[in-house]
């Protein structure tokens, strides 16, 4: 799981790219779970939380830019 300090150091473009990659990974993990091929079930939780952290950072930055 990514540290929040690592995420805050990234630019908006890097965060958007990471978000896309994580969503693809989440999609693949869902299919692996459905077919009982998932090796690390904890990875689903990690990916979900990292996506939430990135979205939170993007929202905070958008709110700060709007002020």
Swiss-Prot record:
This entry's Gene Ontology molecular function terms read: structural constituent of ribosome
Of the GO CC terms on this record, one is:
cytosolic large ribosomal subunit
Which UniProt key words apply to this protein?
Ribonucleoprotein, Ribosomal protein
Biological process, per Gene Ontology: translation
Name the family: Belongs to the universal ribosomal protein uL29 family.
Protein's UniProt name = Large ribosomal subunit protein uL29
Q: Which organism is it from?
A: Rhizorhabdus wittichii (strain DSM 6014 / CCUG 31198 / JCM 15750 / NBRC 105917 / EY 4224 / RW1)
Origin organism lineage:
Bacteria, Pseudomonadati, Pseudomonadota, Alphaproteobacteria, Sphingomonadales
């Amino acid at each position: 799981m990514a540290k929040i300090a690592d995420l805050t150091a990234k630019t908006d473009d890097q965060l958007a790219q990471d978000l896309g990659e994580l969503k693809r990974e989440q999609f693949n993990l869902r299919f692996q779970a459905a077919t009982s091929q998932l090796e690390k079930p904890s990875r689903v939780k990690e990916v979900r939380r990292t996506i939430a952290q990135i979205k939170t950072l993007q929202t905070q930055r958008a709110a700060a830019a709007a002020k």
